Amino acid sequence: MNKVVKKIAAVVLSGLLVASVFAGCSGGSAKDTYTVGICQSMQHPALDKATEGFKKALTDKLGDKVTFKEQNAAGDSTLCSTIVNQYVSQNVDLIMANATDALVAARTATNTIPIVGTSVTSYGVALGLKDETATKTGINVTGTADLAPLDKQAAMVKEWVPNAKKVGILYCSAEKNSKYQATVVGAKLK
């Protein structure tokens, strides 16, 4: 199964999880409608598919009981903050944060509105949690992660170039998750 299909499947499962959260939080009296604010960090085919899959899963589960407010930050992290702050002031029922900048902005904006993230490599790294490898955040954030199997990547490098004295790892130093992956793989190559 390719990476995009896996990501879409994870988003659909995440959407179903969110639908069950809505149902479980009703306390016996379901709301008539739910409003979900979606903040996508930028336009990109993989991110677009993740958002589409999320919306489809919720719509399939909740029908016309769910409405979406969707905005794209066009790669501007400051705009992510503006978008999620609007959602917080509008008191949406849930925020879907698509990519790391959107997730960080959402968590900074609220600790009460549930946040579902996708297209995030490591929630622990992105949110500065003590346990960077945590699958449970212990806060109002959940979602799907796209962390590659770093140990297998390091093993593959060792297999392909067993006599290498040095290995260069390219990464974006401005992206916490990128630096985290480079550090982990680098340590496994030693």
Residue ranges and their predicted role:
Residues 1-35, 59-63:
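Short, low-complexity disordered leader/linker segments with a strong preference
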Residues 26-36, 60-64, 133-137, 158-166:
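Immediate post-signal peptide segment of exported/extracytoplasmic ligand-binding proteins
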Residues 33-55, 61-63, 69-80, 174-178:
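Extracytoplasmic "Venus flytrap"
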Residues 36-40, 54, 142-189:
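An alpha-beta-alpha
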Residues 43-54, 79-83, 91, 98-102, ...:
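Stable alpha-helical elements in mature extracytoplasmic
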Residues 57-64, 186-190:
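Short helix-loop-beta junction
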Residues 64, 90-94, 111-115, 139-140, ...:
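Loop/turn elements at helix/coil->beta-strand transitions in domains of secreted/extracellular proteins
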Residues 72-131:
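Beta-alpha junction/loop-to-helix N-cap segments that form part of ligand/metal-binding clefts
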